[in-house]
């Protein structure tokens, strides 16, 4: 797909995206847009961003041939983009470094964030400590219970973790509360959104900070295999790790791009978090327009996933647009498929993956078995699974 360019000047990716917020937030978002437009044209801003990614985060993250897993499963060769090896254990820190640099540039002394699995909360607390800012992290009460290790990490890093008891007590509700807080303290507070969603300019900004993943992968796969992968695949909740991998590949027409949503118990039940795969209509949530799980009255539906980080009823607007123009295919992995993949990566590769990332390997049979052993699938291993040990143990009936 040549000459891909999005968003437009109003923050739309096709018919998705935009700016749907209260009047009180418009000035803050316009201030942010102006600051980001200035920063992205400033070579020194990007030079400092790259320095921190190298010396603080530990980039580039390697690509790794999962040879034993590939042999066991059959079909295409599986390569992993090892975002789990970043400082803080996931891809989230790529974005929080960029937004913290922008917050400092704007003179903000306090950052707030929402988090589901806790990885974005940890990454936000980390950069707040790194740059000498105070931080408050909003987290659904149910997610706090299933992600206690990350809650403690955030507190160790100096963050104030605020539990959200409203609604479904998960990521959607944490984002609601964070946006309310931003309205109340917009003058001194910078809201670090963790996913490629939210009102403009956040989806573009998060994508630009995360596309280091795909840019590195293109160079690394060329060096390691002499060519680009046949398929590049990533899990999708809001979609920041996926857009980070996909964006540099969009114009590479020979590379199939596949996003994996959370199938939960099954998309034929109410218990999933797969707006595109389930055929959800377009709606507005958290300041942007996109495919959204909702009832006939436009009320946002509850979601379910074994993975807290994918437990979200919407999807980033660029993903919805890429689905519309048929550049990216979207599929699902169910809870049981993700848990099986979690075990396989542990046993065959000595890698404990995040449950979010496990969905990608868990969806692989649908694609991989149709491919030959000389073909390559690049999997974005978006995070490590330390945070999920308690959840997996509980599901296995093991008391830690």
Swiss-Prot record:
Known cofactor(s): pyridoxal 5'-phosphate
CDD domains: Trp-synth_B (cd06446)
Top-rank taxon, per record: Bacteria
Modified residues annotated as N6-(pyridoxal phosphate)lysine in this record: 92
GO molecular function, one term: tryptophan synthase activity
EC nos: 4.2.1.20
Keyword field contains Amino-acid biosynthesis: yes
This protein's pathway: Amino-acid biosynthesis; L-tryptophan biosynthesis; L-tryptophan from chorismate: step 5/5
Pfam families per the UniProt record, alphabetical: PALP
Catalytic reaction equation(s): (1S,2R)-1-C-(indol-3-yl)glycerol 3-phosphate + L-serine = D-glyceraldehyde 3-phosphate + L-tryptophan + H2O
Keywords, comma-separated and alphabetical: Amino-acid biosynthesis, Aromatic amino acid biosynthesis, Lyase, Pyridoxal phosphate, Tryptophan biosynthesis
InterPro entries assigned to the protein according to its UniProt record, in alphabetical order: Trp_synth_b_CS, Trp_synth_beta, Trp_synth_beta/beta-like, TrpB-like_PALP, TrpB-like_PALP_sf
Gene Ontology CC: cytoplasm
Quaternary structure and interacting proteins, as annotated: Tetramer of two alpha and two beta chains.
Family to which this protein belongs: Belongs to the TrpB family.
Function per UniProt: The beta subunit is responsible for the synthesis of L-tryptophan from indole and L-serine.
Protein name as annotated: Tryptophan synthase beta chain
Species of origin: Neisseria gonorrhoeae
